[in-house]
Amino acid sequence: MIISLIAALFVSPPDTLEASSVTASRNVSPPSESVSGVVLRDASSAADAIRDFSGIQLRDYGGVGGLKTVNVRSLGSAHTAIFLDGVPIDNAQNAQVDLGRLFTEDLETIELYAGQKSALMQTAREYGSASSLHLRSSLPDGRKLRLKFRGGAFGTISPSGSVETRRGRFAARLRLGADRAHGQYPFHTLDLGKDTILTRQNCDIKAFRAGGHLWFLPQGGRYEASVNWYDAGRGIPGPVFKQSGKYPMSEDRQYDRSLTAQISGEQSLGHGLSLLVKGRYSLDILDYVDVSELDPSISATWNYNLQSAYAAASLGFQALPWLHLNAAVDAQADWLTANVKAQRQQVLGAFSSAFLLDPWRIQVSAQYQGTSDGYRFLSPALLVDWHPRFDWEFGILGKRSCRLPSFNDLYYTNVGSRDLRPEKVWQVSAWWLWDRSFGPWSFRIREELYFNHVTDKLIAVPNGSLFRWSMFNIGTVHVFGDEWSASSAYTAAAWQAGITARYSFNRAFDPLNPWQIPYIPLHSGSFNIFGVWKSFRADIRGQVTGARYTAASSRPEAFLPAFTTWDMTLSWKGPWGLRLAVELRNITDTRYEIVKQYPMPGFHVMGSVSVEI
């Protein structure tokens, strides 16, 4: 049905899409961080697009096919809910969403909410998430054909294309993409004090993706339906270590096939009522070939079949001009078939009330979560915003949330422990924001102080490969943080320039052990500058990550030094939607590791050409 509707739209002449409004989206505070426009389009994946955000730690295990996850404010990647067009993306098997698989060609924006999203209409899942990352697809504004080719270092070849149209209140998009790379790159290691150059192996990838998206926008509403397919085979780069006089390299392979279908709808019903519904079904088939690094003739193949069904409904009511009420219910079921079988059903219910007392905005909410395997949890939250002037904002947040153990955490022999307890978090934060324009100048400064109290902290550490992890509770963790961001831009008739600087202080430790918890830098930051002149644009991005430890101790073998990387992108925009771009990555050829024994690439060059007709 969806395919036939999309086909009908493409053969019909384009028309004007009338404006529609959904009242529930008003009165929303800005996200903690966001990215859009050229920077988002130039990113190779969602992981690449958000790497400059303050307050996050992006775990990157190197290589084109390496796992990439995001950790917000030292809470772990499982506490960050990922949403695509308002529908959650998750993985009940290992609680790890690989951001390297989420591409940006058709995205309008990526927004990070570190704490509570303030929208009046939300699903129950959103109310209980410690933080959330929202990816939103762009809405077609006419009939267009987009073609893009990206390639360069590591043997990368990545063609993609999309065709979109709109007619009346309908819009549609079809897209295809492929990725291929051998992924090999040189790296340095110390062998008996000597600098030895080796080549990173088993980083190749072959992937194909396809999808379709359909929109219907009646008066006062918005409805979407999409289907996506992903098929990939990749090498899994293992850690670099020396044993028996050699450096055994991982030969593990991973094959993914993923089908997802999702729908969402939001409608104003009149008399102050608004309805929000969402649904998603996903099928993920994963085959993992586990090859012994010391004896490649020994291998084992693991097959995993994960199905997930999700449904949500939310009803909002504008009881008074200054009072908005919202009740939400989510239900999700997950089934995993492998060498063990596991299933989990969970129901989430939430209620919130928002008091819109200008210049104050107060939101009180509570989420209840219950699962078929016996977990019960209540997540209350209080969010207060104060706008004394149009250019100033102050806010405070108090919230409780939890992270359930995944199937891998609980059931797998090499990984799991059935004695694991849910990880519980209390979050408290306060922030201020100044955002002002003076003629051609614009300025924005934001600071946020936060404290996280974590009990029964779940720690995941790679156990020889990216597929086998060791899981354990470590008790209590305290996280104190301070985030700053400042930006300025100047816009003239023929040129534009801007600068953004970010800094994060993050002290995360077990009260019984004064050392920083593993992989969390005390200091980090980023620096971005751009300039536009006529059809030319230049972007410079710098990223600073402080020293870290791979264990909560000061042992020299657990130390990871600080590093700084610099990237530059040069682009030219020509007629007929032609755009050429050259990306210079790690210009200073810095040698660094984000994860111990997983070396990252040095200097490399990527290029792209795109056409929009």
Indicate residue ranges for each PLM-predicted region:
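Structural signature of Gram-negative outer-membrane beta-barrels, strongest in the C-terminal barrel
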Residues: 2, 320-452, 502, 522, ...
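N-terminal periplasmic "start-of-domain" segments of outer-membrane beta-barrel proteins
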Residues: 17-46, 69, 77
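Extracytoplasmic beta-strand/coil segments of soluble accessory domains associated
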Residues: 47-88
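A beta-strand signature from Gram-negative outer-membrane beta-barrel systems
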Residues: 104-146
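Periplasmic-side early beta-strands and strand-to-turn transitions of outer-membrane beta-barrels
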Residues: 134, 142, 166-254
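Membrane-embedded beta-barrel scaffold of Gram-negative outer-membrane proteins
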Residues: 272-288, 394-395, 423-480, 487
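Gram-negative outer-membrane beta-barrel transporters
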Residues: 321, 326, 359, 450-453, ...
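C-terminal beta-signal and adjacent terminal beta-strands/loops
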Residues: 544-551, 570-613
